[in-house]
């Protein structure tokens, strides 16, 4: 049975302390960062070592493209999503990019990348910027839908982020508590559109650590109004809800790590991420042990179903995707 906590490790191999914490059944996933990565073979070995201890863990990474891609040496340098949108055949290129990303990520033993970004580029948020496909909500939904088709064709579940949209809030939730003061109706007409259009295609969503004070005084990731009433109720979304990193400044409004993971799960998150802070991860773990949470079975849907080896580079679709992205001058 998978647990409700996703955490991280400090280096390129498992320490004795890492092995010990991963054995706790409350731990359900592990996310890797650039510090954990040297080259594809090393990542493959790391994933195998993790699965030897806990074969049921979800193994994740942020491999969006552009400036947010942790897997670099030995991997294709993916373009920023905004660069794709600038091409006349953007929909086709987005699908190629989604397939290529998902194939490479799964080939080293990881299950999923937290992608695609569904935020809109309103030219306000530096933390979103070129990570977004577009400022136009319908076109963003179209291109993100193509990216998701590529991911699904490669066997990877898709996670849209950051619900209900981070693009209007100017502050960076990694270091501050952003606010979006617009009304719910304004948000419905713009930032919520990609999430609404793609609710039936997405396997998971990640809410924003942003406060929308006209809707709820809590950040979206701690808000039953956003997660239960709007996402589950109105949009009929039945996939997994991952919290964004509960160590980020935007989550600190709720209290310590134990309070944060408890609040996230109570609001409707299925799994809470606690990264870059082992002491906080241990606090969250202790809270889950006390709460005796039973994670939903839908977490199993997030397991990768694609290549677990390197022969994908001989596949016609790989060569086709590379050729198309090179022709558009999106990759080297």
UniProtKB/Swiss-Prot annotation:
Reaction(s) the record says it catalyses: Hydrolysis of terminal non-reducing N-acetyl-D-hexosamine residues in N-acetyl-beta-D-hexosaminides
An example Gene Ontology CC term for this record: cytosol
Knockout mutant characteristics: Deletion of this gene increases fosfomycin sensitivity.
Keyword tags: Antibiotic resistance, Cell cycle, Cell division, Cell shape, Cell wall biogenesis/degradation, Cytoplasm, Glycosidase, Hydrolase, Peptidoglycan synthesis
Molecular-function GO term, any one: beta-N-acetylglucosaminidase activity
UniProt pathway annotation: Cell wall biogenesis; peptidoglycan recycling
Enzyme class: hydrolase
InterPro entries: Beta_hexosaminidase_bac, Glyco_hydro_3_AS, Glyco_hydro_3_N, Glyco_hydro_3_N_sf, Glycoside_hydrolase_SF, NagZ_Beta-hexosaminidase
Main location: cytoplasm
Residues given in the record as substrate binding sites: 62, 70, 131, 161-162
NCBIfam families for this protein: PRK05337.1 (NF003740)
Family from the record: Belongs to the glycosyl hydrolase 3 family. NagZ subfamily.
Function description: Plays a role in peptidoglycan recycling by cleaving the terminal beta-1,4-linked N-acetylglucosamine (GlcNAc) from peptide-linked peptidoglycan fragments, giving rise to free GlcNAc, anhydro-N-acetylmuramic acid and anhydro-N-acetylmuramic acid-linked peptides. Contributes to intrinsic fosfomycin resistance in P.aeruginosa.
Subunit structure: Monomer.
Protein name: Beta-hexosaminidase
Organism of derivation: Pseudomonas aeruginosa (strain ATCC 15692 / DSM 22644 / CIP 104116 / JCM 14847 / LMG 12228 / 1C / PRS 101 / PAO1)
Gene field: nagZ
């Amino acid at each position: 049975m998978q647990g409700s906590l996703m955490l991280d490790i400090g280096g390129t191999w498992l320490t004795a302390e890492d092995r010990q914490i991963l054995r706790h059944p409350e731990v359900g996933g592990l996310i890797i960062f650039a510090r954990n990565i040297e080259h594809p073979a090393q990542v493959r070995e790391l994933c195998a070592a993790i699965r030897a201890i806990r074969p049921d863990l979800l193994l994740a990474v942020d491999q969006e493209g552009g400036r947010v891609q942790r897997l670099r040496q030995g991997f294709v340098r993916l373009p920023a999503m905004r660069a794709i949108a600038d091409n006349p055949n953007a929909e086709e290129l987005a699908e190629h990019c989604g397939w290529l990303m998902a194939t490479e990520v799964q080939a080293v033993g990881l299950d999923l990348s937290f992608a695609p970004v569904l935020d809109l580029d309103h030219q306000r948020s530096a933390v979103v910027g070129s990570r977004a496909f577009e400022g136009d909500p319908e076109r963003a939904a179209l291109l993100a839908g193509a990216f998701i088709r590529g991911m699904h064709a490669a066997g990877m579940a898709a996670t849209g982020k950051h619900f209900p949209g981070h693009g209007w809030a100017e502050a960076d939730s990694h270091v501050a508590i952003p606010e979006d003061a617009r009304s719910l109706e304004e948000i419905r007409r713009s930032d919520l559109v990609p999430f609404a259009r793609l609710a039936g295609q997405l396997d998971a969503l990640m809410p924003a650590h942003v406060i929308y004070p006209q809707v709820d005084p809590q950040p979206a990731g701690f808000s039953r109004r956003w997660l239960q009433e709007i996402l589950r109720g109105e949009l009929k979304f039945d996939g997994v809800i991952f919290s964004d990193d509960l160590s980020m400044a935007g989550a600190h409004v709720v209290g310590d790590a134990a309070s944060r993971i408890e609040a996230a799960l109570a609001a409707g998150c299925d799994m809470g991420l606690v990264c870059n802070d082992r002491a906080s991860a241990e606090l969250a773990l202790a809270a889950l042990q006390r709460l005796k949470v039973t994670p939903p079975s839908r977490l199993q849907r997030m397991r990768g179903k694609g290549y677990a080896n390197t022969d994908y580079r001989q596949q016609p679709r790989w060569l086709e995707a590379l050729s198309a992205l090179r022709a558009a001058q999106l990759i080297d």
